Each structure stands twice: as structure tokens, then as C-alpha cells.
């Protein structure tokens, strides 16, 4: 998985690309550790994630809780269709803040 982080005064944006699974959890954790302490808003862009597993979901929940404990905002941005389906099936779409740049396509 490719991880790109950009920051400004108050916001960290982490763009993920590829598969986010157990094999990538450690590199994700290393890349984002400290962001919730440093920035008031952490955005994780999931628009280019083709696959996500339970270990990756646990990492997102862990980061969300860490941000909440610090009083920071944590947002998942533009989850791809496969990621959105998993978030909805697990109910994490109700527990995590998700924002779309454009309205999500309706599924039939």
C-alpha cells in the first residue's frame, strides 16, 4: 500500500492507495502515529483502496479513538465502493465519521 501524507497548520491528510490489510497495518501505524497529537483534524482518504480487511478496520478504529481522546477530529474521506460496503456491513459507517467530496453513488 502506498501512503502519502500532507499537512498544513491544523490538518493532516493521509492518502492511501492499494490494499489495506494485515500486511500493511504496521506501516500504516508508523505513518500516522503522532498525527492526532499534532493536528486538530486527521483525514484518511480511502478513495483508492481496493481492499480492506478486519485488521485495517481495527487500525482505523484505534486512530479514531486516539483522536477522540485528544479532542481532535478524525474523518474517513471518499471510501471506495469496496471499502464503503465493508464499513456498512460492519456498522462502522455509523461509528466513524465519513465524508464524501461528492455524493456517494446509489446502489441498487
Question: Locations of the language-model features?
Answer:
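STAS-like cytosolic regulatory interaction modules
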Residues: 1-52, 62-108
